[in-house]
Amino acid sequence: MDSRTVGILGGGQLGRMIVEAANRLNIKTLILDAPNSPAKQITNASDHVDGSFANKEDIEALAAKCDVMTVEIEHVDVNALKEVQKQFPKLEIYPTPETIGLIQDKYVQKQHLVKNRIPVVPSITVENSKESLIKTGSSLGYPFVLKSRTLAYDGRGNFVVKSEEDIEKGLEFLANRPLYAEKWASFKKELSVMIIRSLDGRVYSYPIVETIHKNNVCHLCYVPARVPDSVQHKAKLMAENAIKSFPGCGIFGVEMFLLDDDSIVLNEIAPRPHNSGHYTINACVVSQFEAHLRAILDLPMPKNFTSLSTNSTNAIMLNLLGDPETKDKELQICERALNTPGASVYLYGKESKPNRKVGHINIVCSSMKECDKRLQFIMGLKTDPIKHSVMEILNAEEVRKPLVGVIMGSDSDLPVMSAACKMLEQFEVPFEVTIVSAHRTPYRMNKYASEAVSRGIKVIIAGAGGAAHLPGMVAAMTPVPVIGVPVKGSTLDGVDSLHSIVQMPRGVPVATVAINNSTNAGILAVRMLGIHNYDYVKKMEEFLNKQEEEVLQKAAKLESIGYEKYLESK
């Protein structure tokens, strides 16, 4: 796929999963880290470098063997990277040393974001002294968060100062570190998103994720985030704008807070694959790890490559941490996961230690409710008396993926559009039905239309009244055939809807049926599906034969008893 060698600073689980993605694409990777680190365990290259990614000589040794260098952790020696880049002028380093330097010092990162007008929680620099923190408490109020500027992750660099009495504990907890203080953010949800930045500066977003933390460590990720579309859109724009402000390319994890007043502030950025993006391995078209490789090697990034696999894809990621009391207890969770349809287990080749990340489990289903149900079983929250019924549910046949999307601008259109649904049910066509307003939810409409192909939708039936822009706008954004249903409104008897849908410009066709006749839309959709599935052709032939038989029976009856008795019998 690419003849260049990628050198990775760091051989932990993130490096391991980058290597897994690289192996599928025949991309050679070399690792700088300790012997037998997780990433080195799965590649038999003889020229890995044993050493530290914070040591200049070791970085030089790796640089001499690779064409492109990247990181799986930002805690590297940036000055060494800059010197190595001068020493090896053909070597490409992504993210750039400049970007890593801006991000690895979290206070510098915050100042950079403020400069680029990205909303963040207010923060100030502090000295490592009780007097300085007393002043900070007066300035920011209690509680506030004391944070290490560098070498901090998984909550290990944070200390919540609830009152003046906590100051000395905080200084002891974060001793000998450069510090800053952050105002307490009263948030109701933590959100995260993976953003890809290409070599030419374009950015691509993965779905917004809701993260649940336990003891300051990511415990669960829910995808898509359980927040309104408007919140997801705001979070996506904020994250994209933040990443646009940094030079270079690669994947970035962006963490955000959804505050009590529904505003969003950016918490922090990681210039690498991120724990909250592990779900992408099973739930998305391209995983975060492959996307990172595509970015740093300037490989193709096709349309919708960061999308969920289907419109009905839901996922939960569960982190596996070493149990503080029972060694290898997490393996019991893995055992239950192996018995669970839609669950995938990823172990990192690390010795189990208390609260150490040793793996994760991805659960992918067609609904969040089903994901939650399976999560409960995997975590052992379901008791034995109902275990059998739970397993029956888990092993139930998956709902077939929809082939037809039935959409409408308002629930007031549902009585009309339900006829199309009934027709699809009659022909045993799997379909989905939802509300997508061209005027009130334009971003949702755009997402629905642009992702239709990747989700396996073959035909879209769109009903709309009045201005009736929905069918035409959807047809403009997807190669999937669109059938328009003019819905009769309170004025103009639906003629306005008919004209809006049928009068499409050349190049953007909409197959338009009669006013309020979604029955025909359903039948037409089945005929379209019959082009690729002969089962639907046979069912359509049976349907037509049945119609003919009904008409012939009526004709025979009319001819036999005469029109007057026929009318009386109806």
Curated annotation (Swiss-Prot):
<dbReference type="InterPro" id="IPR016301">
    <property type="entry name" value="Ade2_fungi/plant"/>
</dbReference>
<keyword id="KW-0658">Purine biosynthesis</keyword>
<dbReference type="GO" id="GO:0046872">
    <property type="term" value="F:metal ion binding"/>
</dbReference>
<dbReference type="InterPro" id="IPR016185">
    <property type="entry name" value="PreATP-grasp_dom_sf"/>
</dbReference>
<protein>
    <recommendedName>
        <fullName>Phosphoribosylaminoimidazole carboxylase</fullName>
        <ecNumber>4.1.1.21</ecNumber>
    </recommendedName>
</protein>
<keyword id="KW-0456">Lyase</keyword>
<dbReference type="GO" id="GO:0004638">
    <property type="term" value="F:phosphoribosylaminoimidazole carboxylase activity"/>
</dbReference>
<dbReference type="InterPro" id="IPR003135">
    <property type="entry name" value="ATP-grasp_carboxylate-amine"/>
</dbReference>
<dbReference type="InterPro" id="IPR013815">
    <property type="entry name" value="ATP_grasp_subdomain_1"/>
</dbReference>
<keyword id="KW-0210">Decarboxylase</keyword>
<dbReference type="GO" id="GO:0006189">
    <property type="term" value="P:'de novo' IMP biosynthetic process"/>
</dbReference>
<dbReference type="InterPro" id="IPR033747">
    <property type="entry name" value="PurE_ClassI"/>
</dbReference>
<dbReference type="Pfam" id="PF17769">
    <property type="entry name" value="PurK_C"/>
</dbReference>
<comment type="pathway">
    <text>Purine metabolism; IMP biosynthesis via de novo pathway; 5-amino-1-(5-phospho-D-ribosyl)imidazole-4-carboxylate from 5-amino-1-(5-phospho-D-ribosyl)imidazole (carboxylase route): step 1/1.</text>
</comment>
<dbReference type="Pfam" id="PF02222">
    <property type="entry name" value="ATP-grasp"/>
</dbReference>
<keyword id="KW-0547">Nucleotide-binding</keyword>
<dbReference type="InterPro" id="IPR011054">
    <property type="entry name" value="Rudment_hybrid_motif"/>
</dbReference>
<dbReference type="InterPro" id="IPR040686">
    <property type="entry name" value="PurK_C"/>
</dbReference>
<keyword id="KW-0067">ATP-binding</keyword>
<dbReference type="InterPro" id="IPR005875">
    <property type="entry name" value="PurK"/>
</dbReference>
<feature type="domain" description="ATP-grasp">
    <location>
        <begin position="110"/>
        <end position="297"/>
    </location>
</feature>
<dbReference type="InterPro" id="IPR011761">
    <property type="entry name" value="ATP-grasp"/>
</dbReference>
<dbReference type="GO" id="GO:0006144">
    <property type="term" value="P:purine nucleobase metabolic process"/>
</dbReference>
<dbReference type="InterPro" id="IPR000031">
    <property type="entry name" value="PurE_dom"/>
</dbReference>
<dbReference type="GO" id="GO:0005524">
    <property type="term" value="F:ATP binding"/>
</dbReference>
<dbReference type="InterPro" id="IPR054350">
    <property type="entry name" value="PurT/PurK_preATP-grasp"/>
</dbReference>
<dbReference type="Pfam" id="PF22660">
    <property type="entry name" value="RS_preATP-grasp-like"/>
</dbReference>
<dbReference type="Pfam" id="PF00731">
    <property type="entry name" value="AIRC"/>
</dbReference>
<feature type="binding site">
    <location>
        <begin position="137"/>
        <end position="192"/>
    </location>
    <ligand>
        <name>ATP</name>
    </ligand>
</feature>
<comment type="similarity">
    <text>In the C-terminal section; belongs to the AIR carboxylase family. Class I subfamily.</text>
</comment>
